Amino acid sequence: MVCKVCGQKAQVEMRSRGLALCREHYLDWFVKETERAIRRHRMLLPGERVLVAVSGGKDSLALWDVLSRLGYQAVGLHIELGIGEYSKRSLEVTQAFARERGLELLVVDLKEAYGFGVPELARLSGRVACSACGLSKRYIINQVAVEEGFRVVATGHNLDDEAAVLFGNLLNPQEETLSRQGPVLPEKPGLAARVKPFYRFSEREVLSYTLLRGIRYLHEECPNAKGAKSLLYKEALNLVERSMPGAKLRFLDGFLEKIRPRLDVGEEVALRECERCGYPTTGAVCAFCRMWDAVYRRAKKRKLLPEEVSFRPRVKPLRAG
């Protein structure tokens, strides 16, 4: 197996693309493909300041690395979720990455900001841990982006992630949800734009970039992810991919190019300001504030919080690197 560009020994073979490349040309190809996706979907302006959501895993650190190499002012945001040793190691890896490259890192500690980490939040809210965690992360990432002056947030979602989400959405189809799936969610008042520059890279392709660049990342998965439906969807799609290389990419591209443009969701849902935090919501109080208000009420009943303490939605990130 030789590199298609130079004829030297290939380090990465991509059956789905009919391509094999050596280390040097794979890294070049990966960066150029990312840049092509950014330009194709007008994700970012040249040299723009962008907030990168970083967990310490391979996808988010690789994205931070690539965006920095492409000349964007990429600032990392890490949320310490309070999930025991897993969260501690995630923060350590992220801080080391930022420190070694001289990159700016913002950190929000969920427990310091609101009094509870994800395990306690799940118990007190009555939600599944992934649901409570996901809602909190989405809210905090957007709030930090808006209040720190970022127009756009970039996340490391890859092809496997996006194909699995699409698979799940098609099993339980809702036009409004399907119409929102894609590599870009545009900016709105009070809502930063969301972009996914890695949406056409498989998990293996991102991993290959991470390893060949020598990026140290957290290998372990979140302990709360065990049993998640998304893992089942990924397993099913991997089974298809093994027999039909390129199936996941065709599945996602086909939806984005042929089906999504035809989805008519009618008038957009009207957004208003949340009475508690002022951020956009469809009701009087947003889901984030409702959840945390309920958590504080239950915590007080269980004597976990003093009566005089009240939930305050605003957080101020710490600059850690």
UniProtKB/Swiss-Prot annotation:
Changing residue 130 to S: Decrease in Fe content, and about 90% decrease in catalytic activity. CDD domains: TtuA-like. The keyword Endoplasmic reticulum does not apply. ATP binds at residues 53-55, 59, 79, 156, 161. Pathway: tRNA modification. This is tRNA-5-methyluridine(54) 2-sulfurtransferase. GO terms for biological process: tRNA wobble position uridine thiolation. There is a cross-link at residues 137, 226, 229 (Glycyl lysine isopeptide (Lys-Gly) (interchain with G-Cter in TtuB)). Its cofactor is [4Fe-4S] cluster; Mg(2+). Disruption phenotype: Disruption of this gene completely abolishes the presence of m(5)s(2)U in tRNAs, although its precursor, 5-methyluridine (ribothymidine) is present; other nucleoside modifications remain unchanged. These deletion mutants exhibit a temperature-sensitive phenotype, they are unable to grow above 80 degrees Celsius. Changing residue 59 to A: Complete loss of catalytic activity. It comes from Thermus thermophilus (strain ATCC BAA-163 / DSM 7039 / HB27). InterPro entries: Ncs6/Tuc1/Ctu1, Rossmann-like_a/b/a_fold, TilS/TtcA_N, tRNA_thiolation_TtcA_Ctu1, TtuA-like_LIM_N. Zn(2+) 1 binds at residues 3, 6, 22, 25. The keyword NADP does not apply. The gene is ttuA. [4Fe-4S] cluster binds at residues 130, 133, 222. Binds 1 [4Fe-4S] cluster per subunit. The cluster is chelated by three Cys residues, the Fe with a free coordination site of the Fe-S cluster may contribute to an enzymatic role. Conjugated to TtuB via covalent linkages involving Lys-137, Lys-226 and Lys-229. Homodimer. Is able to form a heterocomplex with TtuB. The thiolation reaction consists of two steps: a first activation step by ATP to form an adenylated intermediate of the target base of tRNA, and a second nucleophilic substitution step of the sulfur (S) atom supplied by thiocarboxylated TtuB for the adenyl group. However, it is not clear if the S-transfer mechanism is direct or indirect. Belongs to the TtcA family. TtuA subfamily. It catalyses: [TtuB sulfur-carrier protein]-C-terminal-Gly-aminoethanethioate + 5-methyluridine(54) in tRNA + ATP + H2O = [TtuB sulfur-carrier protein]-C-terminal Gly-Gly + 5-methyl-2-thiouridine(54) in tRNA + AMP + diphosphate + H(+). GO terms for cellular component: cytosolic tRNA wobble base thiouridylase complex. Keywords: 4Fe-4S, ATP-binding, Iron, Iron-sulfur, Isopeptide bond, Magnesium, Metal-binding, Nucleotide-binding, RNA-binding, Transferase, tRNA processing, tRNA-binding, Ubl conjugation, Zinc.
